[in-house]
């Protein structure tokens, strides 16, 4: 599990070795589409990206986020994972975490969905994630993937997931497809997300398997289950009681 060295340790990224179908197109399929990391200075980071295995999907651009403005760069990694690097431009924007190092923690995960209203209702009813209004917005990497004009707009909503952490929903075009996988492997790209919560048994969800107990790592002896969401996305839940 990767976490920020000098920044927040509350949210991290788990790296899993996986086989990827040769025809996988990460931005043309339903499921977990990308993660967003909060950063300090995008212009400085670009020089490092240019000499790394990561590839830029679109030029840097500025856009609105909540009540402020952000600078955004989308990149793709060697596992076909899409990552958005976000620099906050407004000093008075308080809804996003403040980066404590050059590249800090994930603060948002994006889900590509068939129907945004159905997905919002699912996460509200099952995990009590509050619903937020939909807006129409340009999403350049998505338009590029489908060879649409970049001024094409899509329905999206940003839903508060936790403290300064968001679940963003994108309603994808009709010609999007299910995300295929190689038998015995996880879905390629961003394969799933993990959520910790105090009590799993209180939820009305259909588990893929019976709950198991984690045998090692940071959540040793904690209960764990997985389920599929409204668009077939994989979600892992870990029962973990935070100590005061």
Residue ranges and their predicted role:
Residues 1-13, 20:
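Hydrophobic, helix-prone linear segments
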Residues 1-2, 21-29, 40:
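Post-signal peptide N-terminal segment of secreted/secretory-pathway proteins
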Residues 11-14, 36-37, 43-102, 111, ...:
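Vicinal oxygen chelate
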Residues 17-21, 33:
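Conserved donor-binding loop and adjoining core beta-sheet/short helix segment
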Residues 25-27, 99-100, 183-185:
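Short consensus segments that form the blades of beta-propeller domains
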Residues 30-34, 106-107, 188-190:
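Eukaryotic phosphotyrosine signaling hubs
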Residues 45-52, 115-131:
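Amphipathic alpha-helical segments
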Residues 174, 184-195:
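Low-complexity, glycine/alanine/valine/leucine- and proline-rich hydrophobic stretches
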């Amino acid at each position: 599990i990767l976490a920020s060295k000098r920044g927040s340790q509350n949210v991290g990224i788990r790296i899993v070795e996986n086989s990827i179908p040769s025809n996988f197109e990460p931005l043309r399929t339903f499921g977990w589409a990308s993660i967003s990391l909060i950063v300090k200075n995008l212009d400085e980071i670009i020089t490092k990206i240019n000499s790394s295995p990561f590839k830029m999907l679109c030029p840097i651009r500025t856009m609105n986020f909540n009540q402020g403005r952000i600078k955004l760069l989308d990149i793709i990694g060697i596992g076909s994972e899409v990552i958005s690097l976000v620099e906050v431009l407004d000093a008075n924007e308080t809804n996003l975490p403040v980066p404590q190092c050059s590249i800090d923690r994930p603060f948002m995960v994006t889900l590509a969905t068939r129907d945004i209203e159905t997905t919002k209702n699912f996460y509200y009813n099952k995990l009590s994630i509050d619903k937020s209004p939909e807006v129409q917005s340009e999403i350049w990497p998505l338009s590029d993937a489908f060879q649409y004009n970049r001024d094409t707009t899509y329905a999206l909503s940003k839903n508060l997931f936790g403290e300064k952490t968001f679940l963003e929903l994108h309603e994808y075009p009709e010609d999007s497809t299910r995300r295929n996988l190689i038998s015995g492997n996880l879905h390629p790209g961003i394969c799933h997300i993990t959520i910790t919560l105090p009590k799993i048994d209180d939820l009305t969800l259909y588990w893929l398997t019976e709950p198991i107990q984690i045998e090692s790592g940071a959540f040793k002896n904690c209960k764990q289950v997985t389920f599929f969401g409204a668009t077939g996305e994989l979600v892992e839940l870990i029962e973990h009681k935070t100590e005061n």
